[in-house]
From Swiss-Prot:
Sn-glycerol 3-phosphate binds at residues 105, 134, 136, 189, 242, 252-254. This is Glycerol-3-phosphate dehydrogenase [NAD(P)+]. The keyword Transport does not apply. InterPro entries: 6-PGluconate_DH-like_C_sf, 6PGD_dom2, G3P_DH_NAD-dep, G3P_DH_NAD-dep_C, G3P_DH_NAD-dep_N, NAD(P)-bd_dom_sf. The keyword Nuclease does not apply. One of its GO terms (molecular function) is NAD binding. It comes from the Bacteria. Pathway: Membrane lipid metabolism; glycerophospholipid metabolism. NADPH binds at residues 11, 30, 105, 138, 253, 277, 279. It catalyses: sn-glycerol 3-phosphate + NAD(+) = dihydroxyacetone phosphate + NADH + H(+); sn-glycerol 3-phosphate + NADP(+) = dihydroxyacetone phosphate + NADPH + H(+). It is found in: Cytoplasm. It holds the Pfam family NAD_Gly3P_dh_C.
Amino acid sequence: MNITILGAGAWGTALAMSLADRHSVMLWGRDAAVMQEAEQRRENTVYLPGFRLPDSLSLSSDFSAAIAHVGTDGLLLVATSLAGLRPLAMQLQPYAIPNIVWLCKGFEADTHLLPHQIVREVLGNDIPAGALSGPSFAQEVAQGLPCALAIASDNAALRELVVSAVHGPSMRIYSTDDVIGVEVGGAVKNILAIATGIIDGLKLGMNARAALITRGLVEITRFGVALGGRTETFMGLAGMGDLILTCTGDLSRNRKVGLGLAQGKKLEQIVTELGHVAEGVRCAQAVRSLAAERGIDMPITNAVAAVLFDGDLPREMVGRLLARDARNEMA
């Protein structure tokens, strides 16, 4: 199968490596210099250093060539950041693409839209579209370590296409039609990972970490169901699975934000050290606003947003959460 991946960051590169042994894969990146160096060195030294790119993997900075590679029956995967999704979708408007599947997570900063809403707004409703999400660190995928993801789409044929293309020896793909649930799970877990990083950075113990992750799952579910997702989706890979990985994994950028905040660092310093803004930072403001508009109780999200944007100290965040009134666990 012909597969084009738009976005040569760590995740796009890792997925391209995983698929190149059994498909004709082209990885497109916007920066011609980065792609030329990757072609010459057979290594993406900027975004995924230390991993040799398969000889069978094609690299390009030519957008038209990358889209042409998909053909009429291939698969188009978008591995940009959420901030890059709308500009890329607009760039796709002149082309006849057979489908589109995105890997980004979050809510758009200005509009508070989910990825599927952005794609539909720009490209319309006729193109088969879906979200590929779940617990996945790029470095582990590049190593060929086991991984499981979920493809969410309201188009059954696209779900089958993605499963047949991406499912492989070290990667299992499950399918669902709950696009909203999968996208909300992938977005809100980043906020909770910041909170978990704060808990760990303050050395409050594993009991506190477990409590926060568990109550965080309740919070994700409450929010996601209010937006139209299904409860069971949040018990799966894009909910509980992604939440556990992002909150506990040492490779988690969002957890690193929380650790830095607990150490007294300013957000600007943390972002500089990371090299880019972690999605949870962008997402916290959007989710706080959406929850307030809809009257959804989001105590952990609100506490994280207060630390990020309102000047609250990390210990104040913890104190505020512990001071909440007792309640039924499922409330």
